[in-house]
Amino acid sequence: MANLGSEAEREPLLGPGSPGSREWSEIETQEHYKSRWKSVRILYLTMFLSSVGFSIVIMSIWPYLQKIDQTADASFLGWVIASYSLGQMVASPLFGLWSNYRPRKEPLIVSISISVAANCLYAYVHVPAAHNKYYMLIARGLVGFGAGNVAVVRSYIAGATSLQERTNAMANTSTCQALGFILGPVFQTCFALIGEKGVTWDIIKLQVNMYTAPVLLAAFLGILNIILILFILREHRVDDLGRQCKSVNFQEENTDEPQIPEGSIDQVAVVATNIVFFVVLFIFAVYETILTPLTLDMYAWTQEQAVLYDGILLVAFGVEAVLVFMGVKLLSKKIGERAILLGGFVVVWVGFFILLPWGNQFPKIQWEDLHNSSTPNTTFGEIIIGLWNSSREDHSEQPTGCPIEQTWCLYTPVIHLAQFLTAAVLIGTGYPACSVMSYTLYSKVLGPKPQGIYMGWLTTSGSAARILGPVFISHVYTYLGPRWAFSLVCGIVVLTILLIGAVYKRLVAFSVRYMRIQE
């Protein structure tokens, strides 16, 4: 909080020693402080590797799927990509609940082991004689299931940091996550040098090529992560003021000693924050999904151009997110997390409002049939098909523009490139600010109680948004066009802003709500 000096983080802190309670009698020594932050940094790495595990194969899934199973089509590709989020959605509350009652090492090691095994399965999906595409579906779903440990990571960091440290720690977590999404495709590009044939070990039926090398690297990094967790991670817990506490996971039951009444969690604030986080991830999924189809339709780009330019834009988006994460750490100390959350949604609303088409200039119409249409039929993952095919096709005769099958192309004005880029900057600023502030506030609202299951539900809401967002924008954009699509998104953002305004006073730290400390 504002009245706590930053130097206090490094000083030994003496608990108040409340009668009848041993929990608050601990002192945070310098050794404990170093061990606590060493453990937190191990979980930063875990978050980074989880993101890399998702993004390191995202651009090569389609060609690999075609190679192992000729019956796979674009629709099945959408299921393969969505299976990651489905797996994470199911696993998050389970791992979160587990972490509430047992040492966090257990769900972390089990979840990472599942991811390692799933990545190895992905490398061997070419071996079965039939139904290979379903093995890939299972592999990606299990990788997502292993990524459910995000709930454990966030709950650990929330419990191992004081209120003053929390925003910085959560921002660092988001930074590592964003870096994982950025660097994953970079690793994939490097492995492309190996080629499709690569090297084969017949004895173990292992093919190391441009498709399998990335997942084998992810599996190796996962094993290193398990080793670090086993030997470095320690159970740490501090209260909102930073005083050392005994971890709930190891606290012995003692019915003879009275317990300090902790108060109840504000469930209204909990539900509201889950809704807010759902909208945050929904917005990102919508924007990510619509990016390439929109540029194909509005600017008559070829698929090669769209993949190149939009890929550059997404990398810039990730870099901008990292800068925003670093910026909010400083800004939150001056204006608070709630103001940043509200301001972030306002910026996002302005971004989508700018994307609304105006004027009397219309996009180029594509009169010819285009088999690989720019219509976003399922998810952003289908656009990966264009990335792989673009390097093999002759684009000199490829029809470009807004396909006539989308009737709105005939009467909807074009979105000018300046509009598009301005909106990208604004959305790229607002989204990461809203993301980190939403689960930072969430962790503070929950207070000193174990947060595993609650963080699991938060991660589940985010996974659901990543599944539903592409479905929503695909149908609305295809049949009604960008004006309706972005207008509805603006409406959703306005409703979310009103929700934040309604619960604004409730979005305070647990200790502040019960007046144990002053905000």
Curated annotation (Swiss-Prot):
GO biological process: apoptotic process; astrocyte differentiation; autophagosome maturation; autophagy; cellular respiration; determination of adult lifespan; gene expression; gliogenesis
Matches recorded under Pfam families: MFS_1
GO molecular function: chloride channel activity; fluoride channel activity; iodide transmembrane transporter activity
Subcellular location: Endosome membrane; Lysosome membrane
Primary localization class, coarse: membrane
Glycosylation sites: N372, N377
UniProt keyword Isomerase present: no
Family note: Belongs to the major facilitator superfamily.
Name used for this protein in its record: Major facilitator superfamily domain-containing protein 8
